[in-house]
Amino acid sequence: MDAVNAFNQELFSLMDMKPPISRAKMILITKAAIKAIKLYKHVVQIVEKFIKKCKPEYKVPGLYVIDSIVRQSRHQFGTDKDVFGPRFSKNITATFQYLYLCPSEDKSKIVRVLNLWQKNGVFKIEIIQPLLDMAAGTSNAAPVAENVTNNEGSPPPPVKVSSEPPTQATPNSVPAVPQLPSSDAFAAVAQLFQTTQGQQLQQILQTFQQPPKPQSPALDNAVMAQVQAITAQLKTTPTQPSEQKAAFPPPEQKTAFDKKLLDRFDYDDEPEAVEESKKEDTTAVTTTAPAAAVPPAPTATVPAAAAPAAASPPPPQAPFGFPGDGMQQPAYTQHQNMDQFQPRMMGIQQDPMHHQVPLPPNGQMPGFGLLPTPPFPPMAQPVIPPTPPVQQPFQASFQAQNEPLTQKPHQQEMEVEQPCIQEVKRHMSDNRKSRSRSASRSPKRRRSRSGSRSRRSRHRRSRSRSRDRRRHSPRSRSQERRDREKERERRQKGLPQVKPETASVCSTTLWVGQLDKRTTQQDVASLLEEFGPIESINMIPPRGCAYIVMVHRQDAYRALQKLSRGNYKVNQKSIKIAWALNKGIKADYKQYWDVELGVTYIPWDKVKPEELESFCEGGMLDSDTLNPDWKGIPKKPENEVAQNGGAETSHTEPVSPIPKPLPVPVPPIPVPAPITVPPPQVPPHQPGPPVVGALQPPAFTPPLGIPPPGFGPGVPPPPPPPPFLRPGFNPMHLPPGFLPPGPPPPITPPVSIPPPHTPPISIPNSTIAGINEDTTKDLSIGNPIPTVVSGARGNAESGDSVKMYGSAVPPAAPTNLPTPPVTQPVSLLGTQGVAPGPVIGLQAPSTGLLGARPGLIPLQRPPGMPPPHLQRFPLMPPRPMPPHMMHRGPPPGPGGFAMPPPHGMKGPFPPHGPFVRPGGMPGLGGPGPGPGGPEDRDGRQQPPQQPQQQPQPQAPQQPQQQQQQQPPPSQQPPPTQQQPQQFRNDNRQQFNSGRDQERFGRRSFGNRVENDRERYGNRNDDRDNSNRDRREWGRRSPDRDRHRDLEERNRRSSGHRDRERDSRDRESRREKEEARGKEKPEVTDRAGGNKTVEPPISQVGNVDTASELEKGVSEAAVLKPSEELPAEATSSVEPEKDSGSAAEAPR
């Protein structure tokens, strides 16, 4: 009994809840009942007691409890072992008598459950049919419920039609029919006439009608025979699945209704069920809409018997004899009644226009008007299937239809608004076509089993069709088509029916209920964001609900349609969803809120134009419903609404704004082809930060669009590389930023820019490429940190080489030295760089982009300047050191130790030596544009050592970078002579801190480099140590040695590269230098290389030319020693060691 008591408590706790009852609660009750299955009789009695004693609003929840318990028991234990179903059926009539005491609006839910039971075989038809009839009887008081009952009940009981209840119903219906407005009866009959047989019946009816009073009482036997034959056909056609009657618009509605019941059958959704039906109706205003829809269903079911009955109206129905001949008398009475409304039917057929007015009240009347349309005959076929149930349904349907129709003025209006259906029938001779069309209109229709448009919307539509026809017969098809299209668009946008003289404020706010208290905003957002953007989410955890404001009405509508159908869960808890009143609607207007449609219909005379804008909060204004006098005021809301609805973005999209953006992008697109265009684009971007890459991003985006075109054009670009360079550059990060600044002047003559770029590019790129490759090779061999060093060196070297080459130099230097050094090098190279700023940006990119070729650009960038440039920023700290070393390294290789080149000296690029010479490498060195001046500055000893050895150029570099003296070690004689290692260290420290910064702007790096060198030096020292057995570590501090070793390695690596290059041109020199180098390194390394070093430093300025030659020799010497060494790496290391040892020795 504990289980029974628990169930009792659980069930009666419903009283404490406000309907609708949640699914979770229903599940708890069901579980408690199943637990008490051993005392199932007690459980059944408790439920019946609850239904008997509860308040009217809890009647339907009590029915849901019965349904849930029975279905769960059947599912869990099987239909054979289910004990609850049979027990409930014993006293079910009394129970349903209490159930029908529920509010009239809930009776449709009871019928819904009965239909589900019938459909799923929960109870036998013999049990269900009387209950449906009971609903019909109560429906006399409450026609809506009756309609639903008839529609849905009748299809399942079709066979039962002949049963006594139908017969009784028929007589009842007969009186009802006379009572019904003729228009209502016509609505029902009209649907019947839609079938082909119905049309035949129509003809017969016309014969009846021809005499103002049909000869119904004295129907000719022939006529009766015809009617019966048609009825028989209808019966036979019913062979189509009875569900097909659903195909018939009314039956379909029922089917849709059933399906809705099945799909959405949720105890929580009690109110929603009604809402759903309305939703399915789309325009159906209220449950009456479903009821109205239902009446069509009855007619559909009636078709077999009812269709004839309708055709000859009621009399045929009885005569049809489904119930039996006995029925005929009532049928005749019906027929007499029919006589009263037949003239109207005739009138409608003859003059639809006149009868329009009556028809609208009966949403179904339009169907009657449709009769003339042939397309409906196919529809009639679907109707046929329902024939067996037709009689009862028909009788009930008359009553039900009658009231539903009267109750459905809104539906009628909506339907009227749906002229589309008219055309649908016109365009589609096939029932199916029209059906599919309507189905497409409303998703629910689609879902209906039969596939025919759901009866509600359909029959509504069919009504609208006939009505439209009558009403709009004068209208041109094109106009109707436009109207239909507009209506369809509105439906797709989720906009409700338009009411005359009424403003529609469509809510975009959804209410989601029954949420678990742990549910987060993210959970809700993830549920709804798939439908569209969410404006805001307001969670109310205590109430377990949330208000979600969607940006677009259409998205909210789709979310509601989908989530209200299936069993969607958040945090494993089923949710409910419904329209919520948007915040903008104040209390004064809440009375106009329609929760079913999610719209507030505010009469124009109640609207204050100044409030229109506020209505849009959490909703949108339906621009089609606004008073033309307000248009100016609500435009903002309208625009927002349009955007929200996704409907009229045109309003919100100011044409001007669109053109503005479009023009900009458009020019960019053409720009690729017309090089001239890009400059304009670039300038706009340039205005902000022309030189900085930042521009590039802005320019980049437009150029991005262009660059792809540019690349497309890129194919052609080879011929016009300069032009392409702009677009290409714009696409390229560097070019866009830099090019814009540089190109503006040279844009017209991009060629002019490219030439500078080209020489520097070609030379620097080749040289740089060589240098980078050599550096990488040497570094990889000599330096444990070759990658970093190589990157730095490569960058530095490339920068130096560029500097050395004049025009090329500025870009490279700037590119390599994006930091302050860039400006300084530029200043040093001022003569060389035309536009240091722009050139730097442009040239560097150009170097990186060698050709204006798109392909090359990306490729070269990584290997060439661009990559160094890019790397440089990140590697700047490490590179600065390697750059000095590298710069000096290369200089030693090429011209001895002209370290200044690293700063911008051309000496550093001996590999470019030939170029350097023509470029004025000596000149640069001498004049001090880059190398000379810097070297003179840094190389205090340069003049003295000019005569001395190739190292002279290197010597200056050495003073600048003591370690670079060791690169001379690669040219060993100079390095050894460059004893200034001590001096170098001093110079480095002194000059690096001051001079280097001044000259190269890198000196800051130089100092860093020394520190880095220490880091790298350790690594290099290790490698060097292996190769530098000669060095005496004791002479100098390991740090210094490490620095020197690093520098030497860098120099050697660069030197080797330079040497290789120089060796090509100066093999003989190399031989000479090798001899010298071998002798000198030893002497300098361990004798007093400092002296020798000093003269080279002093000589640097004068020795530039000589240094270049000597560099070649020194390189040769270095190369040879390196060759002599077991491996290049070791060789490079050993010379470094030698120089390092020499440097150490002086100290």
UniProtKB/Swiss-Prot annotation:
Q: Where's the RRM domain?
A: 508-582
Query: Which residues get modified to Phosphoserine?
Result: S154, S656, S1004
Q: What assembly does the database describe for this protein?
A: Interacts with POLR2A; via C-terminal heptapeptide repeat domain (CTD) phosphorylated at 'Ser-2' and 'Ser-5'.
Report biased composition (Basic residues) as residue ranges: 434-475
Its protein name is SR-related and CTD-associated factor 4
Q: Where in the cell is it found?
A: Nucleus
Taxonomic lineage of the native organism:
Eukaryota, Metazoa, Chordata, Craniata, Vertebrata
Domain CID as annotated: residue spans? 1-139
Q: What does this protein do?
A: Anti-terminator protein required to prevent early mRNA termination during transcription. Together with SCAF8, acts by suppressing the use of early, alternative poly(A) sites, thereby preventing the accumulation of non-functional truncated proteins. Mechanistically, associates with the phosphorylated C-terminal heptapeptide repeat domain (CTD) of the largest RNA polymerase II subunit (POLR2A), and subsequently binds nascent RNA upstream of early polyadenylation sites to prevent premature mRNA transcript cleavage and polyadenylation.
Question: What InterPro entries does this protein's entry cite?
Answer: CID_dom, ENTH_VHS, Nucleotide-bd_a/b_plait_sf, RBD_domain_sf, RRM_dom, SCAF4_RRM, SR-CTD_assoc_factor
GO terms for cellular component: nucleoplasm; nucleus
Q: What is its main location?
A: nucleus
Region feature (Disordered): 145-179, 235-254, 269-331, 424-502, 629-661, 879-1147
